[in-house]
A protein has these predicted regions:
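Acidic-glycine-rich active-site phosphate/pyrophosphate-binding loop
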Residues: 59-70, 213-219, 285-295
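Short pre-catalytic strand/loop immediately N-terminal to key active-site residues, enriched for Gly-Thr
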Residues: 84, 204-211, 229-230, 300-304
Length: 354
């Protein structure tokens, strides 16, 4: 028996086992829209406050006059190679949809698909522990789940939350004159592309993990503010895609100020060097006709604005007089990069960036 025979096989990088990663592996918005058009329209349920009609973040079902259930699911393939971090990021991303509806999570179920004969069991266990650690931080149990043997690693959660029916925040309720506030910096997709190309240094990796594992807990408090009209989170369709959902839902124009957008460090330089995800182009192809980019924006603007965010920030549409309270709510929970990025105005359902 040779020495080579005794050498255990190398554990593959998680990102090498998937064709996409994080929210960048979502079905392209144009394809998804076409698929949903072919689905059977759902029956009418009077207590279903939020369903599939407006591309919102989660379903909401009213139990009584005082309480409604928020239900969502989110899972994806690895965006990083560290299994514990992958679990943390996926869980944080899944819980975000509950917060984006103004809800408070109460429990989660794990959704697990793993190539059992490829990954060591300890690697898979570390992914699960990562997700459990985030749920513990959110104060909820992982109360069960489902697992399959799959070709690519997949992990996420089905998350359940509660909200008062009067505090449900939809992505279709913005008003003309509302100010847009973004909770987290942008550029996660770019950094994940750099990681896959072995171009991301330790500092870049640390900032990517820090932002993607920060729970969007201010959502429930924001929903209680009287001046907050609409709420969503920025994920796989990029800032433009999710801002356009606000605009379409309200039949308004969203104006975004490019110079006010917060970016993660080095993302503009990466894009200038051609480092970004394929999802960016798919996003633009799906909704670019409803976006106006002003002349004079930097050449990297389109790729950055369509960059898919994994576990991205909350996007708030609020009355001007509520801006200080919204920013204070973010700051109190450590969202130091939260920023005013634009406003909603009368006009066609589109996004204007200047």
């Amino acid at each position: 028996m040779t020495e080579a025979t005794l050498t255990p096989p190398a554990v593959p990088r998680l990102t090498s086992l998937s064709h996409g990663g994080g929210c960048g592996c979502k079905i392209a918005p144009g394809v998804l829209s076409e698929l949903l058009k072919r689905a059977t329209p759902p029956a009418l349920f009077p207590d279903l406050l939020v369903g599939t009609e407006s591309s919102d973040d989660a379903a909401v079902y009213r139990l009584n006059d005082e309480q409604a259930i928020v239900a969502t699911t989110d899972f994806f393939m690895p965006i990083v190679d560290d299994p514990f971090d992958f679990g943390r990021i996926a869980a944080t991303n899944a819980l975000s949809d509950v917060y984006a509806m103004g809800g408070k999570p109460i429990l989660a179920l794990a959704l697990v698909g793993m190539p059992i004969n490829v990954l060591p069991h300890e690697t898979i266990a570390a992914i699960l522990r990562g997700g459990e650690s985030v749920c513990a931080e959110a104060g909820i149990p992982v109360a069960g789940g489902h697992s399959i043997d799959s070709v690519e690693p997949i992990y996420g959660l089905a998350a359940i939350g509660v909200v008062h029916p009067s505090r449900v925040k939809r992505n279709a309720a913005a008003r003309a004159g509302d100010v847009l506030v973004l909770g987290k910096p942008l550029g996660v997709g770019v950094l994940s592309a750099a990681l896959k190309k072995n171009q991301l240094d330790a500092a870049g990796y640390a900032q990517m993990v820090a932002t993607t594992t920060k729970l969007n807990r201010p959502g429930a408090e924001l929903a209680a503010l009287p001046g907050v009209h609409a709420l969503t989170d920025v994920t796989g369709f990029g800032l433009l895609g999710h801002t356009l959902e606000l605009a379409r839902g309200a039949n308004l124009t969203a104006r975004v100020h490019y110079a006010s957008l917060p970016w993660l460090a080095a993302v503009e330089a990466f894009v200038a060097d051609g480092v970004f995800t394929g999802a960016s182009g798919r996003n633009w192809a799906a909704y670019g006709t409803d976006v106006r980019l002003a002349a004079g924006l930097p050449p990297v603007a389109q790729a950055l604005l369509t960059d898919p965010q994994t576990s991205g920030g909350l996007l708030v549409a609020c009355a001007p007089e509520a801006v200080d309270d919204v920013l204070a709510c973010f700051r109190a929970d450590g969202f130091d990069r939260a920023a005013v990025i634009g406003e909603m105005v009368d006009g066609p359902s589109r996004v204007d960036v200047a």
